[in-house]
Amino acid sequence: MKILLIGPPGSGKGSVSELLTKNNALKHVSTGNLFRAILKEDSELARKIKEINVSGGKLVPDEITNQVAKSAIDELIKNQQSFILDGYPRTINQALALEQYCDLDYIFYLDINHQELMKRLTGRWMCPKCAGIYNIHFKKPQVDGVCDNDQATLYQRADDHEDAVSIRLDEYDKLTLPLIKHYKTNPRFIKINANQPIKDVYEDINNYLKQNK
């Protein structure tokens, strides 16, 4: 089973993916996580990504993104492992590259309004140890500024600051909205209301998967 979750930053792709992977024996493929892992390396690819200023909200070019994503996806296909794609593809060129070697079974579009996006993104804080995600509006830690799991001090990523969020959403509108139009003609395209709580978004998708196996 090969699933794509598509939607703007803050629509809940990562959180929904985590819930789905726990209950459906799926692997979570997040280009964001892949890039963060690469940035910890001392490699030419890491240096190229750093030069792009990802923390400032800019997207990594298609050529590099396709290379990183294909490496991860090829390995899963080789091992016949079901997976969820989160954050890839984001552009028409990326989608066309993916279609060369991967036939998606489900394409879930997380539809959400701009006001809710800003609330979610600018209120998001993360744990540096376990990568746990909190939000000051609807998913607060038990102790302000402290992770529930390991008591590490939470931090806000640079790309979750208001200025960077605005840049990310502008980039999304420019590059990813055409991608949604591309996928809308696909019979495997399913629109999900992502303005509702993450748990309800997950339930909608999980129920759809159960009913359409």
Curated annotation (Swiss-Prot):
AMP binds at residues 31, 36, 58-60, 87-90, 94, 157, 168. Keywords: ATP-binding, Cytoplasm, Kinase, Metal-binding, Nucleotide biosynthesis, Nucleotide-binding, Transferase, Zinc. It catalyses: AMP + ATP = 2 ADP. One of its GO terms (biological process) is AMP salvage. Its main location: cytoplasm. It is an enzyme of class 2 (transferase). It comes from the Bacteria. Belongs to the adenylate kinase family. This is Adenylate kinase. The gene is adk.
